[in-house]
Swiss-Prot record:
Family classification: Belongs to the heat shock protein 90 family.
SUPFAM superfamilies in alphabetical order: ATPase domain of HSP90 chaperone/DNA topoisomerase II/histidine kinase, HSP90 C-terminal domain, Ribosomal protein S5 domain 2-like
Region (B) location: 339-553
InterPro entries found in the cross-reference section: HATPase_C_sf, HSP90_C, Hsp90_fam, Hsp90_N, Ribosomal_Su5_D2-typ_SF
Database matches in Gene3D superfamilies: 3.30.230.80, 3.40.50.11260, Heat shock protein 90, C-terminal domain, Histidine kinase-like ATPase, C-terminal domain
Entry keyword set: ATP-binding, Chaperone, Cytoplasm, Nucleotide-binding, Stress response
One family name in Pfam for this protein: HATPase_c_3
C: annotated span: 554-626
Keyword presence, Chaperone: yes
Gene Ontology molecular function: ATP binding; ATP hydrolysis activity; ATP-dependent protein folding chaperone; unfolded protein binding
Oligomer status and interactors: Homodimer.
Protein name: Chaperone protein HtpG
Localisation: Cytoplasm
Lineage: Bacteria, Pseudomonadati, Pseudomonadota, Gammaproteobacteria, Enterobacterales
Length: 626
């Protein structure tokens, strides 16, 4: 409907908005006071926007730079008004912001609400629909607003009961900014009480740097006055000794839209060539959109305590995108933009410093095993992006990565590289690892039979990112990494030390190798005997310079051309099946057995075959004729 600003107009909420309102009103009862948090947060954001826009257009202040948020409790009509003298809204803003929800995450939010009526309240803030929480406690909501710089007769009033329609009209409004009046339902009258308002503000908004004032009755003077009920000082500007643990946690919950406590945090003021303050938090739970690298993330940026922007991703690398917090710089210009940040030398230096600081915080956190297990479960996969992205800090990142390992005998990733190296065998030259589709496939792989027998530990990697990560983890503590599924002299050296009979077997079974090599000449790179196997007749490995099986799978999943891998076939001369095949004089049957053996190895290695039907037919033939 086209808006005619000269008269009151009634609009219908869009269907999606109706559904959201219904769900919020009927589902979010576990913590009704969240509406307070959201409305005060919106008011603070409006004042931040005014301060930012007034840098280039000071006339927006309208000769009034005394900024505040005010709460007015009216017990005569059971209404609660939260007002601010921030940027305000235009007529079009009211229609776009309060009449329809145009945010991309709304459908996902509704879907989540439908799935779980016990949805956590932090999702309200995450999805940007906090204003609508007003209807949890109200039977009617009235919004009066005027955009800074517009005439007094260009104010706007918005009214709704949240049941499907809303009214909009122009009004005269002397003060710029926005006031939201909630007409509370009977079971929410407690929010009119001074003690309840003060407790709620203290709980959620004490850290907000803008004064929050409450209309308070002076018994002596028999009059009302505006009493400030918050500290109105940015928490990061205060000395650490004056900030309680609870205040830090509440500040985190506000900026991160999270109801969970953070795992840890760091608060530092840096002086010298660059002057800045940081307050950074490590969450205890990942955000719903953390896995999308392209989604907005980053720190809140302030310059000389003036809010500049959210999601300033230039200050931390992508693999630390889970970090929440603020940076307040004294050196960046107040008119800084995202484009300027991209190439600003100061930002580059800040990013280096902040990255090292976060890695130090994570190292300290890793000393607390139980807390670090929580961190790794939530953010380990993201941190694994680090070795490829950040060569400068690769060693520090390596110290933070946790692995499952063969000798730990558990899927839980608790092994650090420091501990692995500390427990290496005396004659062990390298750090051994195996990559697989999952933990079960890895631990049952024939590649590990020798290591199990000799009690040599192997790191087990079963996340999709692992193969890619290991291309960048070349060595640690002067020990090179080595895949057990690749040809390697250090492994052969360990095997040879344990088995001096290898040459004898080669002499006794040379004919077997020649016949097998002739049969598989176009399919394999080489064939040889090995004593790495104890229970398995044969396995395949890749040449040291060949693409690994897991990397080939990654290429294939990404739709890229995968080069043909020619494997090395390793034969266990002690196995009964190998001895049986060696005794087979019928050349046709021998070839069938060798092809079966090779295809069996490919299936174990790749979990798939190019032609499974041919493999089944071969098995059937061998069963019938033997």
């Amino acid at each position: 409907m086209t808006a005619n600003k000269n008269q009151k107009k009634t609009y219908n909420f869009k269907s999606e908005t109706k559904e959201l309102l219904h769900l919020m009103i009927h589902s979010l009862y576990s913590n009704r006071e969240i509406f307070f948090r959201e409305l005060i947060s919106n008011a603070a954001d409006a004042i931040d926007k005014l301060k930012f826009n007034a840098i280039s257009a000071p006339e927006l202040y309208e000769n009034d730079t005394n900024l505040y948020i005010r709460i007015f409790s009216n017990k005569n009509n059971n209404s609660l008004t939260i007002s601010d003298n921030g940027i305000g809204m235009k007529y079009e803003d009211i229609i776009n912001n309060l009449g329809t929800i145009a945010k991309s995450g709304t459908k996902e939010f509704i879907k989540t609400l439908n799935k779980n009526n016990k949805i956590k309240n932090d999702l309200i803030g995450q999805f940007g629909v906090g204003f609508y929480s007003s209807f949890i406690v109200s039977e009617k909501v009235i919004v009066k607003t005027r955009f800074a710089g517009l005439k007094e007769n260009q104010g706007v009033i918005w009214t709704s009961d949240g049941k499907g329609t809303y009214e909009v009209n122009e009004i005269n409004k002397k003060e710029r900014g926005t006031e939201v009046t909630l007409y509370l339902t009977k079971d929410h009258y407690e929010f009119l009480e001074t003690w309840k308002i003060q407790n709620t503000v203290s709980k959620y908004s004490d850290h907000i740097s803008i004064p929050i004032e409450l209309n308070t009755y002076d018994e002596k003077e028999k009059t009302y006055f505006w009493k400030q009920i918050n500290q109105a000082e940015a928490i990061w500007t205060r000395p650490k000794s004056e900030i309680t643990e609870l205040q830090y946690k509440n500040f985190y919950k506000k900026i991160a839209n999270d109801t969970n406590d953070p795992l840890t945090w760091t608060h530092n003021k840096v002086e010298g060539n660059q002057e800045y303050t940081i307050l950074l938090f490590i969450p205890s739970k990942s955000a719903w959109d953390i896995w999308n690298r392209d989604n907005k993330h980053g720190l809140k940026l302030y310059v000389k305590r003036v809010y500049i922007m959210d999601d300033a991703e230039q200050f931390l690398p992508n693999y630390l995108r889970f970090v929440k917090g603020i940076i307040d710089s004294n050196d960046l210009p107040l008119n800084v933009s995202r484009e300027i940040l991209q190439d600003h030398k100061l930002v580059y230096n800040l990013k280096k410093s902040l990255t090292k600081k976060v890695l130090q915080v994570l190292h300290s956190l890793s000393q607390n095993v139980s807390k670090y297990e929580i961190f790794w479960k939530q953010f380990g996969l993201i941190l694994k992006e680090g070795p490829a992205e950040d060569s400068e800090n690769r060693t520090s990142i390596s110290n933070l990565i946790r692995f499952s390992s063969l000798l730990n005998n558990t899927q839980k990733p608790t092994m650090s590289l420091e501990n692995y190296v500390k427990n290496m065998k005396q004659n062990q030259e390298k750090i051994y690892f195996i990559t697989a589709d999952n933990y079960a496939s890895a631990v049952s792989s024939p590649h590990l039979e020798f290591f199990k027998k000799k009690n040599i530990d192997v790191l087990i990697l079963s996340d999709k990112i692992d193969e890619w990560m290991m291309n960048y983890l070349i060595e640690y503590n002067e020990k090179k990494f080595q895949s057990v599924s690749k040809d390697d002299k250090s492994i052969e050296k360990l095997v040879h030390e344990q088995n001096s009979q290898n040459e004898t077997y080669q002499e006794n079974m040379n004919d077997f190798l020649n016949r097998a090599k002739k049969t598989l000449s176009d399919k394999i790179k080489d064939i040889r005997f090995t004593h790495k196997l104890t229970n398995t007749p044969a396995m395949v490995i890749t040449d040291s310079n060949e693409m690994s099986t897991q990397m080939a799978k990654l290429f294939s999943a990404a739709g890229q051309t995968v080069p043909t891998i020619k494997y090395i076939l390793e034969i266990n001369p002690n196995h009964l099946l190998i001895k049986k095949i060696n005794n087979e004089k019928n050349e046709k049957k021998f070839k069938n057995w060798i092809n079966f053996l090779f295809e069996q190895c490919l299936l174990a290695e790749k979990n798939t075959l190019d032609n499974p039907n041919k493999f089944i037919a071969r098995i059937n033939d061998l069963l019938i004729n033997n």
